[in-house]
């Protein structure tokens, strides 16, 4: 399946793209140097799985590595003046890309996508050599690493280095789409269409048609790159109960050349409003309790990369089946297809920023802080077209938060980039490396194990429980080997886990509405390595809870926190 359904150049009739996932030549190297060209490498790696994973075939970390692949580019990709674009979903941490010995791209940041026009580097015929040189530091560096560690322990897990998302080629016109965003109007009857372009795009025009169930419901034309208002007839709103998505067909025209893509988006708003005198989160103008699970995006065989698209979808679907309406995507950014499934299945998403290493707050240089700010901007810009994402979380428990004002600064930075969503300036205001309240952002957020936390809103912010629960139950024969178990909140058996979950969530149902709590996040949807506090085992083979009981209490809690 096409790796980026939010900007799909291929149609069912014209699948004009070429996957480069599969076996690549591979070599770990001693340091960062220009690779040798035209020479085979001794080992192999299965892309797009990080080198530490079983599926990669390597199962060993290296700070430096080189990937090599020979590719026959179809003649149709360069016919009629087309250009060839090479796309990478993500490479951890820094990547330099060469085609036939010519450097075509350099990218810093392990959680964001990048691409390169490689047309001028292609040979007239025969195989094309693609080489990717990667620097993947994990420990001892102040960059976004999330929970990756070279020595996993407790709440920190195996590293995920190298190419860990899809790689593909596609033919494009000289002027082409790089990104399309559809931002719902506050009036909920239109989208603002924003296009980002690549190549020579002077005097290019954009035409977009919106479809609902295959029928056109709006269209707009104008200058490419400028924001355009696309009015929608008889608006159909997106919500977890009804995750309706509009389909869009967009054409970028410049002279005789056309770039045609399909996209999609849901029509919804998210914000804070006074409800009964208290600040509450409102979805489409209505108070909504955001009942979520913590989702860390780890798999035993692929680490950061799901083994299949079905596996990627599984956690989202099961979260929905259990009666939750929200996911907190914890300290990780997922491939575009993950958000596609969240959009379609209907779950709201709190999107964390992958953290800098914890415990290093006093050691961060000005360059470290600037690098984090730059990465935050890149992640927001990449993901702000995703319907499911309703809010951003720049800091978790103070990890990498170098000062109290830093949370306010990042919250303001994100709000300027994306005023259409909520910003939770720091999750876990009462915990760990957090030093104090910056009095910024849209929410007050506390962590309380086992909890739940019941913080009250204040004069400017709504409130939520950002993490609670963590009831721990290991299941024999489904436990990650050779990792110390993090045993907080242990229960003796499945019955105790079920009873504990129901009792815990009932507190939110019974006390949350009166206090004005707008949401909660239960830790967590699956076990992860040494953490056995999932509702599913790490291998996803055992559901530890009674789905019917969990769904019933969850639905009651969402109703209690909704419109009166």
State the predicted function of each range:
Residues 1-58, 133, 137-142, 163, ...:
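Accessory carbohydrate-binding/adhesion or oligomerization-edge regions at the termini
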Residues 10-11, 25-31, 57, 62-176, ...:
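Accessory beta-strand-rich segments of carbohydrate-active enzymes
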Residues 24, 101, 167, 246, ...:
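Conserved, mostly hydrophobic/aromatic
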Residues 99, 190-222, 228, 248:
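Beta-strand-rich binding/interaction modules
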Residues 104-105, 217, 288:
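Short hydrophobic beta-strand segments in globular cytosolic domains
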Residues 171-201, 280, 557-564:
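Surface beta-strand/loop "capping" patches
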Residues 180-182, 249-319, 556, 563:
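N-terminal carbohydrate-binding accessory modules
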Residues 326-554:
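Substrate-binding/catalytic cleft of secreted carbohydrate-active enzymes
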């Amino acid at each position: 399946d096409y790796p980026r359904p939010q900007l799909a150049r291929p149609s069912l009739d014209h699948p004009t793209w070429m996957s480069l996932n599969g076996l690549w030549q591979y070599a770990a190297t001693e340091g960062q140097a220009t690779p040798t060209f035209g020479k085979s490498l001794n080992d192999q790696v299965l892309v797009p799985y990080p080198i530490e994973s079983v599926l990669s075939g390597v199962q060993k970390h290296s700070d430096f590595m080189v990937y090599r692949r020979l590719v026959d580019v179809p003649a149709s990709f360069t016919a009629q003046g087309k250009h060839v674009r090479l796309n990478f979903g993500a490479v951890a941490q820094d990547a330099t890309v060469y085609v036939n010995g010519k450097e075509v791209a350099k990218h810093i940041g392990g959680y964001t996508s990048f691409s390169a026009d490689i047309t001028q580097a292609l040979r007239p015929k025969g195989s094309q050599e693609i080489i990717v040189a990667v620097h993947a530091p994990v420990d001892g560096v102040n960059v976004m690493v999330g929970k990756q560690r070279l020595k996993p322990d407790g709440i920190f897990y195996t590293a995920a280095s190298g190419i860990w998302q899809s790689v593909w080629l596609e033919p494009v016109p000289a002027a082409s789409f790089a990104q399309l965003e559809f931002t719902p109007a506050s009036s909920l009857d239109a989208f603002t269409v924003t296009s980002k372009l690549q190549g020579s795009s002077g005097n290019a025009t954009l035409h977009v048609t919106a479809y609902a169930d295959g029928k056109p419901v709006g269209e707009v034309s104008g200058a490419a790159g400028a924001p355009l208002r696309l009015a929608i007839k008889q608006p159909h709103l997106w919500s977890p109960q009804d995750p309706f998505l509009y389909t869009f067909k967009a054409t970028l025209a410049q002279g005789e050349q056309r770039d045609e893509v399909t996209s999609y988006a849901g029509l919804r708003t998210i914000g804070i409003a006074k409800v009964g005198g208290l600040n509450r989160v409102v979805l489409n103008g209505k108070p909504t309790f955001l009942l979520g699970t913590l989702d860390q995006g780890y798999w035993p065989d692929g680490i950061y990369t799901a083994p299949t698209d079905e596996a990627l979808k599984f956690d989202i679907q099961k979260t929905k089946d259990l009666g939750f309406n929200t996911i907190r995507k914890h300290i990780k950014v997922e491939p575009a297809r993950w958000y596609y499934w969240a959009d379609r299945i209907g779950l709201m998403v709190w999107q964390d920023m992958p953290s800098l290493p914890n415990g290093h707050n006093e050691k961060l240089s000005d360059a470290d802080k600037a690098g984090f700010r730059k990465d935050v901007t890149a992640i927001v810009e990449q993901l702000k077209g995703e319907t499911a994402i309703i809010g951003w979380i720049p800091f978790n428990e103070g990890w990498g938060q170098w000062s109290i004002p830093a949370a306010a600064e990042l919250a303001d930075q994100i709000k300027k980039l994306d005023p259409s969503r909520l910003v939770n300036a720091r999750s876990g205001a009462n915990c760990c490396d957090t030093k104090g309240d910056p009095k910024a952002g849209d929410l007050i957020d506390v962590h309380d194990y086992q909890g739940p936390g019941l913080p009250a809103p204040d004069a400017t912010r709504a409130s939520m429980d950002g993490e609670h629960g963590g009831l721990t139950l290991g299941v024999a024969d489904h436990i990650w080997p050779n990792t110390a178990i993090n045993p907080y909140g242990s229960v003796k058996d499945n019955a105790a886990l079920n009873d504990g979950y129901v009792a815990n969530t009932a507190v939110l149902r019974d006390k949350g509405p009166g206090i004005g709590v707008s949401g909660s996040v239960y830790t967590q949807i699956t076990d992860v390595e040494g953490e056995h506090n999932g509702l599913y085992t790490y291998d996803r083979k055992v559901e530890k809870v009674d789905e019917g009981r969990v769904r019933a209490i969850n639905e009651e809690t969402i109703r209690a926190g909704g419109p009166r």
